[in-house]
């Protein structure tokens, strides 16, 4: 196997990895699944009517 053939195989492998990983990045939106919260969870109130999010401006307790 010559150097030119090895380089061509290397380029094909890099291209294949790029093509396969691109759709996976789009599905994850580039965000950590654990860090992602839904809008209804961000400003959800607990039993006492307090907002659980520290950045919440309304219904703050404590």
Curated annotation (Swiss-Prot):
One example of the protein's molecular function in GO is: toxin activity
Q: Name one Pfam family in it.
A: Toxin_8
- Give the disulfide map: 50-56, 51-61
List localization entries: Secreted
- Output the Gene Ontology cellular-component terms: extracellular region; host cell postsynaptic membrane
Q: In which tissues is it expressed?
A: Expressed by the venom duct.
Q: Which positions carry the signal peptide feature in this UniProt record? A: 1-21
Record-stated family: Belongs to the conotoxin A superfamily.
Which InterPro entries does the protein's record reference? Conotoxin_a-typ (IPR009958)
The job of this chain, per UniProt, is described as: Alpha-conotoxins act on postsynaptic membranes, they bind to the nicotinic acetylcholine receptors (nAChR) and thus inhibit them.
Give the protein's recorded name. Answer: Alpha-conotoxin-like S1.1
Quoted from the entry, the domain comment is: The cysteine framework is I (CC-C-C). Alpha4/4 pattern.
List keywords of the entry alphabetically. Answer: Acetylcholine receptor inhibiting toxin, Amidation, Disulfide bond, Ion channel impairing toxin, Neurotoxin, Postsynaptic neurotoxin, Secreted, Signal, Toxin
């Amino acid at each position: 196997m010559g150097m030119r053939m090895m380089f061509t195989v290397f380029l094909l492998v890099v291209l294949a990895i790029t093509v396969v990983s691109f759709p996976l990045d789009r599905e994850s939106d580039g965000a950590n699944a654990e860090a992602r919260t839904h809008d209804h969870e961000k400003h959800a109130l607990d039993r006492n009517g307090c907002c659980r999010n520290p950045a919440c401006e309304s219904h703050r307790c404590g």
